[in-house]
């Protein structure tokens, strides 16, 4: 009887451990490599933004009309091609914002924050697509840790695009906020003023 109870406990523990390990790997795979239905696509992002933030349509249309909404690409140290949009301020300025999106989003879905910085505050803005999101390549979402290196590279690119005397703020939402805080722990260039 005692032997049977010990075997039952061992079997229950093995089943529980197997379920925990299997579930952990499933959730890890689901979180880092979500299927196409979960990731925000560029084609779906514009209608989403216009529906939820109607004030964006005239601004984005005017930017496109005068070719002020620009794309740029870089290759990160791991050889992954990354994408970003950038928009110069309405009047020349050294103030620049790098705006980092959240989990499964893309740069387009940060246009409402870009509008605030660019149109209302008069900043130059750069909106990167993090790895495996938007138009950027990558095998998996990095949850901010590896993205911090990419954002540091984007900060240097923004400084080159908008002039070498920039005063830069780095702003992130959700996972982009976590990425921004990870960036803040790295050695910063003098042009970075706040996070």
Residue ranges and their predicted role:
Residues 1-17:
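N-terminal Sec-pathway targeting helices
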Residues 15-74:
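An N-terminal hydrophobic leader/cap segment in hydrolases
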Residues 77-88:
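A short loop-to-beta-strand scaffold at the N-terminal edge of the catalytic core in hydrolase folds
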Residues 94-102:
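Short beta-strand element of the alpha/beta-hydrolase
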Residues 103-117:
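The serine-hydrolase catalytic nucleophile loop
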Residues 117-137:
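Conserved alpha/beta-hydrolase
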Residues 141-162:
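Alpha/beta-hydrolase active-site loop
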Residues 157-161, 166-195:
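Primarily recognizes the serine-hydrolase "nucleophile elbow" in alpha/beta-hydrolase
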